[in-house]
Structures are given as structure tokens and as C-alpha cells.
Swiss-Prot record:
It is a multi-pass membrane protein. Pfam families: IRK, IRK_C. It catalyses: K(+)(in) = K(+)(out). Residues 78-105, 123-131 are extracellular. Inward rectifier potassium channels are characterized by a greater tendency to allow potassium to flow into the cell rather than out of it. Their voltage dependence is regulated by the concentration of extracellular potassium; as external potassium is raised, the voltage range of the channel opening shifts to more positive voltages. The inward rectification is mainly due to the blockage of outward current by internal magnesium. This is Inward rectifier potassium channel 13. It comes from the Eukaryota. Keywords: Cell membrane, Ion channel, Ion transport, Membrane, Phosphoprotein, Potassium, Potassium transport, Transmembrane, Transmembrane helix, Transport, Voltage-gated channel. Phosphorylation at Ser-287 by PKA increases them. Homotetramer. Interacts with RAB28; the interaction may facilitate cone outer segments phagocytosis. The lineage of its organism: Eukaryota, Metazoa, Chordata, Craniata, Vertebrata.
């Protein structure tokens, strides 16, 4: 706690525990005592959309099998109640109307249920037009079967067309770096669109998670900007973008960098973009731990020229970092104070905090 004599105990966000958000954007938080049963099933559509494909296929296959079995039982019960099971269907009594021809066992009833749902015509087994119960049951099965097929088809289309799938083509650098831009330290990361189709209206936001006051998580917004673009949105995302956060005294990261062993924190980065073809918004997430922030490094160049003068993106250099050249020392001014910054056990460097930011 800031400005307090109480010792902060923070056992949750430590490096021996898993990160809250994985590098590919999935949450690792587990909900104890969350709602279950009917309250959980109210969002059945959302549950299906979040399922993995193998479980979704299993659920849909089981739905069809259960549908066929339920109506097989109903057709069998109808045949038994009508007295059709023990009859010779080729020579029935003159005063007896067979509801469904040749249903003499449960296997035959299941076969008829399957045939009713999946075909447009009947073979040797067919319902009699003189049996109202058979016609009513046939109509009910067809209606429920069409509803089930429509629901499953819609779920497949919705899952395939989700914007989430487009987000998988957005790639963040595995590491972030702290480098000097115009003599001022900046936290930098890169993001790339690995598909040739562009994204528009790109927005980046970040949240710094720290544990304070005996296990309570504290969230702080961290602002990033893109080169010299004054707008919060990048209108066109086709080549790798580099985002910067200026480490000035008001930055939530400035105080964290003053420790030889910085307290554990997690910086979660969110990128939202709009698909040009559909207008749908997709989001990609990643996170950076203190061990994934490289001090006095910069990213390798990604752009090159081809033989015809066209731009080429060297994705093999995407995660490569190189040590930056040390900037000459700046004379102290009355408005600057010295502090030592240590990250991940790297070399100890002397910086000065001024009104314009950290300078070496």
C-alpha cells in the first residue's frame, strides 16, 4: 500500500503462479462457486459458441441419436398399442388398420424413425393414411427434426464465421522492450497482421494488473500510441505496427522499474480491429510479465526492398531484438532526480526522472 507502514502481502501474482492471461489471449482464471445447472444453461447458445469443435461435434451427434431414439420408442409404443407387433403385415385381418407397415420390432421402429428424418420417401415401411395417430406423430417428428437441423446448421455457420477466427491471424511479439526514442525511454511492442487482407479502425489498450492489500487486484490503464498518429485509431493495418508507451513520472510503470527485483505484475494488451470485408470487430489479447520486458533493447528491422523495389516484410525478424546504442549522459538539472532501474536481473542503469520522462 502506498504511503502506509503496513507490509503488503501479495501471494497471488507471483512468478511461481500462472499468468492471468496467456500469450495467446486465453484467461487462466478459475471460478469457484460459479452458477451451475439451469442458470448456466440459459446461455446455451454462448456455451455452444465457446465449445471446442470436438465437443460441439459430439453434442450435435448425440442430439441426432437421441432424437431418433426418442421417436423410435414412440413409434414402437404406437405399434404396440395398435396391436401391430404380433400381426402378419402381409395378410392383416380385414377389420384391422396397421399404422406403420412392417414395424414388428424396436429395430424396425428405429429404422423407420431414421428414415422419416433423413429421407424424402419411404420404402417397405410407411405410415397408413387411415391411422390419425401415425400422421400426428409423423408431423411432430418432422417439425422437431427440422428445428434441430436448423439450429445445428446455424450454430455451425455462426462458429465458422465468428470474428474470433480472424483474430488468430494477429500476432504480438513475445517480448516487449524498453528503448530510448528521442532520448526518452519507451516501452515498445510490435503487432503484425499475418493475412494479406487488411484490418481497419485498429485500437490498442492495455491494463496493468498488480496485487495490493492482501490479494486485491489493482488495475491501471496504460496508454500506448502508434508512431506519429494523433488519432486513437489506426485506419489501416496491413504491415506490422509498433506501439510505444512513454515512461514518464506519471506512468504506472515508472515506479515499478525503480526496484532491483521489480514486484510481479502483468501487463495485458488488447487490440481491437474491424474486418474490412464484413465490418465485424475482432479482438486479440496477450500479456507481458516482468521477465518478458527487455531493458535497453530494440526490435530488428522488418521492412526490406525486393528486387523490383516493392516492400517486403521479414517475419523471421519479428521477435528478434538487438541491444540499443547507449545514449550520452545528460547533465543534471535541478528538476531531475537520480534512480536506479533494474529489470530481470539485467545490468543496473542510472536514470533521471524529469518532467519530460526518464533519461539516462
Amino acid at each position: 500500500m502506498d504511503g502506509s507502514h503496513c507490509k503488503v502481502i501479495a501471494p497471488l501474482l507471483t512468478e511461481r503462479h500462472q499468468r492471468m492471461v496467456t500469450k495467446d489471449g486465453h484467461s487462466t482464471l478459475q471460478m469457484d462457486g460459479a452458477q451451475t445447472g439451469l442458470a448456466y444453461l440459459r446461455d446455451a447458445w454462448g456455451i455452444l459458441m465457446d465449445m471446442r469443435w470436438r465437443w460441439m461435434m459430439l453434442v450435435f451427434s448425440a442430439s441426432f441419436v437421441i432424437h431418433w431414439l426418442v421417436f423410435a420408442v414412440l413409434w414402437y409404443i404406437l405399434a404396440e398399442m395398435n396391436g401391430d407387433l404380433g400381426l402378419d403385415h402381409d395378410a392383416p385381418p380385414e377389420n384391422h388398420t396397421i399404422c406403420v407397415k412392417y414395424i414388428t420390432s424396436f429395430t424396425a421402429a428405429f429404422s423407420f424413425s431414421l428414415e422419416t428424418q433423413l429421407t424424402i420417401g419411404y420404402g417397405t415401411m410407411f405410415p397408413s393414411g387411415d391411422c390419425p395417430s401415425a400422421i400426428a406423430l409423423l408431423a411432430i417428428q418432422m417439425l422437431l427434426g427440422l428445428m434441430l437441423e436448423a439450429f445445428i446448421t446455424g450454430a455451425f455457420v455462426a462458429k465458422i464465421a465468428r470474428p474470433k477466427n480472424r483474430a488468430f491471424s494477429i500476432r504480438f511479439t513475445d517480448l516487449a522492450v524498453v528503448a530510448h526514442i528521442d532520448g526518452k525511454p519507451n516501452l515498445i511492442f510490435q503487432v503484425a497482421n499475418t493475412r494479406p487482407s487488411p484490418l481497419t479502425n485498429v485500437r490498442v489498450s492495455a491494463v496493468l494488473y498488480q496485487e495490493r492489500e492482501n490479494g486485491k487486484l489493482y488495475q491501471t490503464s496504460v496508454d500506448f500510441h502508434l508512431d506519429g498518429i494523433s488519432s486513437e485509431e489506426c485506419p489501416f493495418f496491413i504491415f506490422p505496427l509498433t506501439y510505444y508507451h512513454s515512461i514518464i513520472p506519471s506512468s504506472p510503470l515508472a515506479t515499478l522499474l525503480q526496484h532491483e527485483n521489480p514486484p510481479h505484475f502483468e501487463l495485458v494488451v488488447f487490440l481491437s480491429a474491424m474486418q474490412e470485408g464484413t465490418g465485424e470487430t475482432c479482438q486479440r489479447r496477450t500479456s507481458y510479465l516482468p521477465s518478458e520486458i527487455m531493458l535497453h533493447h530494440c526490435f530488428a528491422s522488418l521492412l526490406a526492398r525486393g528486387s523490383k523495389g516493392e516492400y517486403q516484410i521479414k517475419m523471421e525478424n519479428f521477435d528478434k531484438t538487438t541491444p540499443e546504442f547507449q545514449t550520452p549522459l545528460v547533465s543534471k538539472s535541478p528538476n531531475r532526480t537520480d534512480l536506479d532501474i533494474h529489470i530481470n536481473g539485467q545490468s543496473i542503469d542510472n536514470f533521471q526522472i524529469s518532467e519530460t520522462g526518464l533519461t539516462e
